[in-house]
Amino acid sequence: MLNYKTATNEEINYNGIVVKEISPTMKLNLRGKKREFFTNIGKNLNMLLPTEANTSTISDKLTAIWLSPDEWMIVTNDEVKKDTNEYQLNEILFNDISKSSLGAIIDVTDQFVQLEIKGKNIYEIFSCLLYTSPSPRDGW
């Protein structure tokens, strides 16, 4: 279920770098190994899941991204309407896959934020090191 609240409704411009939040897109995490899982997914999504590492398949409405040999991310190619809180596809897959113990369907839409970043120094920003681990001198 989508409980999306945007962090910002505006573009932020700082020293020629523009950051804007992109409207959310539905994201479902799929896990399964059984042949019936693949048959059911293919029937419901009208597409085949990629089976090679670091590949994806695309249809008119959906993109399937390979995450591991038994895990995929399904992303809608359309932005989510903010006035709805249900996904028909999520419910269909949950009923056909999870309830029948063929695999797992997890809605991870609220877990990720997508940002559009543009400006003349973008490559310099992304080439900078970012330390995320605490330093021993910080008392850890």
Q: Which ranges hold each PLM region?
A:
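Conserved short beta-strand edge segments in small beta-sheet-based binding/regulatory domains
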Residues: 100-109
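A glycine-rich, hydrophobic loop/mini-helix early in the fold
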Residues: 42-75, 82-97
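A short secondary-structure junction signal
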Residues: 92, 125-128
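Helix N-cap motif at beta-to-alpha junctions
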Residues: 77-82, 120-122
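Acidic, proline/glycine-enriched N-terminal capping motif
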Residues: 1-59
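Short helix/loop capping segments that flank catalytic or ligand/cofactor-binding pockets
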Residues: 38-39, 84, 125-126
